């Protein structure tokens, strides 16, 4: 962080990834709450040496007080990080800098997002009362459920291999399992699993297990959710709903043109939901005539992208939380939402090369049918497909307040000519000429979507919070 970064950050005021503290002579206790909150959310910057003014004290909300001995503060900070004050130290020397600003010395602390194995990051040795998260510009205690979710996610083995006691083969919908096995046999005709009976087949897929310590056996979370009877699933997972809405070609007064949710006419397990929704999503996507050898190639990049998005929805959802797996089809976009938060940082997901499914057994089941992968190339597949169509970059967002992950695949052009015309109309030709391509892009997104945020622009332009802060400040 440099002087210009300080100017742009202060202009945008405190928010989800930026906090100021007075700290003239020592580290304030509240720094550790913010440290925990940033680490458990998306990371951020803490600036020491700046106090918040009362509203009546002038236009600027900040008073630059400076720190008297930055070297002492840095040592105090790292001594505390390496003590029992915090559960883990995720900072390096490069994360703490001294900055000169308005003839005062400030200390900048960059707190990165902790990786999923390190979370929850908590303070004072108190897991339940010392774990914080960041919402808007404040630090808040995590609820017991939020702490439990972070602990679950820290397990590399995932969540879906656990034995669900008192649920067995009687709770499997055999029509669903037969449909899966038929597709499996078609995709893998020589596979050894084809000769197994249903229980052994499920056991090898991770859908059935035995606790060797107790001798108890039964369905796993993956087995019940993927192939279970609807009633059995609703009895055990009444916290989860499945919902698909087609909102294309709506007439006045219509809320949807097609909907798939539980209505008693189908067994509402994940495999049935996945196959029914996928068919509806791609049914009217054009398939250009392309030959691969002597056969027609019907699998377009957009078909692959939609499959990947739906696969991600199912394998990354947190089925222990209360929420909805929601899929929406609109005239100009596809929308996917699932309960839970992201295990990996958003920037890392866009880059690809790393895959950490919350439900690896469900992921394996779908992959054996040709859906998705486990090498981290899935999301770049979605990005590349949109780029080939000249669509906007797909927007992946998470809400730590609502505990949801949302993906929007927009069919709008990157920057439509009507956006440029609108900007010329409201800003004037002269102003638009002075804007660079990134500034025009930000204003275009704001016009199309109604507003923009730092985190959204980070994703769309592949920039960090400080870089986007400078752009927003310039506008």
Predicted regions and their residues:
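Alpha-helical DNA-recognition elements
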Residues: 474-475
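Conserved N-terminal catalytic/coupling substructures associated with nucleotide/phosphate chemistry
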Residues: 1-302, 311-423, 430, 444-447, ...
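Conserved polar catalytic motif of the HATPase_c/GHKL fold
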Residues: 307-308
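Short helix-coil-helix linker/hinge
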Residues: 432-440
């Amino acid at each position: 962080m440099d002087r210009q970064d300080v100017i742009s950050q202060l202009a945008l005021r405190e928010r989800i990834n930026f906090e100021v503290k007075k700290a003239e002579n020592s580290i304030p206790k509240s720094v550790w709450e913010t440290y925990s909150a940033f680490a458990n959310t998306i990371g951020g910057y803490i600036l020491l040496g700046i106090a918040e003014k009362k509203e009546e004290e002038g236009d600027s909300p900040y008073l630059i007080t400076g720190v008297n001995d930055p070297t002492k503060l840095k040592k105090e900070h790292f001594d505390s990080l390496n003590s029992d004050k915090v559960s883990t130290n995720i900072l390096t020397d490069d994360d703490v800098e001294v900055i000169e600003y308005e003839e005062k010395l400030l200390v900048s602390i960059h707190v990165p997002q902790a990786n999923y194995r390190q979370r929850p990051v908590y303070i004072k040795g108190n897991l339940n009362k010392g774990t914080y998260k960041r919402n808007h510009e404040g630090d808040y205690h995590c609820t017991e459920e939020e702490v439990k979710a972070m602990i679950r996610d820290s397990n590399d083995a995932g969540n879906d291999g656990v034995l669900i006691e008192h649920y067995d083969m009687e709770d499997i919908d055999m029509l669903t399992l037969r449909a899966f096995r038929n597709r499996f046999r078609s995709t893998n005709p020589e596979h050894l699993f084809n000769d197994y009976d249903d229980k052994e087949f499920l056991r090898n897929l991770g859908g059935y297990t035995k606790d060797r310590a107790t001798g108890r056996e039964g369905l796993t979370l993956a087995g019940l959710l993927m192939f279970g009877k609807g009633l059995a699933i609703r009895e055990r997972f009444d916290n989860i709903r499945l919902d698909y809405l087609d909102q294309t070609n709506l007439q006045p007064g219509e809320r949807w043109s097609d909907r798939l949710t539980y209505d008693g006419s189908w067994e509402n397990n994940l495999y049935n939901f996945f196959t029914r929704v996928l068919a509806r999503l791609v049914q009217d996507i054009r398939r250009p005539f392309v030959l691969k050898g002597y056969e027609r190639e019907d699998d377009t990049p957009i078909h692959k992208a939609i499959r990947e998005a739906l696969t991600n929805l199912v394998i990354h959802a947190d089925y222990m939380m209360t929420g909805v797996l929601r899929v929406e089809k609109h005239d100009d976009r596809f929308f996917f939402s699932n309960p839970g938060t992201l295990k990996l940082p958003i920037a890392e997901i866009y880059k690809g090369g790393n895959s950490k499914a919350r439900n690896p057994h469900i992921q394996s089941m779908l992959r054996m049918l040709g859906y998705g992968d486990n090498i981290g190339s899935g999301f770049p597949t979605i990005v590349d497909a949109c780029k080939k169509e000249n669509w906007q970059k797909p927007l992946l967002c998470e809400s730590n307040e609502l505990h949801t992950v949302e993906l929007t695949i927009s069919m709008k052009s990157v920057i439509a000519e009507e956006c440029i015309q609108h900007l010329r109309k409201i800003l004037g030709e002269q102003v638009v000429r002075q804007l660079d391509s990134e500034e025009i892009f930000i204003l275009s997104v704001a016009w199309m979507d109604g507003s923009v945020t730092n985190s959204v622009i980070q994703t769309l332009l592949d920039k960090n919070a400080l870089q986007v802060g400078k752009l927003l400040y310039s506008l």
